[in-house]
């Protein structure tokens, strides 16, 4: 489907308290993805990279936030906008080793 490599589509996993809760309770994994990536491309990239079956992909664009820069005078800038994807895996697939490589899990996997 896509000519891009999977690691060009998936930029990095998002590791926060909320994403960890989604991971443990609902089998959902959160990634920062390329801004122009589509849902089918994201699904294909996750399936190829991690050898799992993806049930569903939800995407959202995170708006830029204002930041203050204290140089000579008070100046304002913004962070860049980015795209977030929440990937739901099939029911039988739970807690893969690729998650533990990013964050040490309690179960010692």
Swiss-Prot record:
The record's Gene Ontology biological-process terms are: translation
User: GO terms for molecular function, please?
Assistant: rRNA binding; structural constituent of ribosome
Signal sequence segment: none
This protein's superkingdom? Bacteria
Q: Does the keyword RNA-binding apply?
A: yes
Q: Reply yes or no: does the keyword rRNA-binding apply.
A: yes
Alphabetized, the UniProt keywords read: Ribonucleoprotein, Ribosomal protein, RNA-binding, rRNA-binding
InterPro entries the record matches: Nucleotide-bd_a/b_plait_sf (IPR012677), Ribosomal_uL23-like (IPR013025), Ribosomal_uL23/eL15/eS24_sf (IPR012678)
Alphabetized NCBIfam families for the sequence: PRK05738.2-4 (NF004363)
Role played: One of the early assembly proteins it binds 23S rRNA. One of the proteins that surrounds the polypeptide exit tunnel on the outside of the ribosome. Forms the main docking site for trigger factor binding to the ribosome.
> What is the protein named?
Large ribosomal subunit protein uL23
* Species in which this protein is naturally found: Aquifex pyrophilus
Gene encoding the protein: rplW
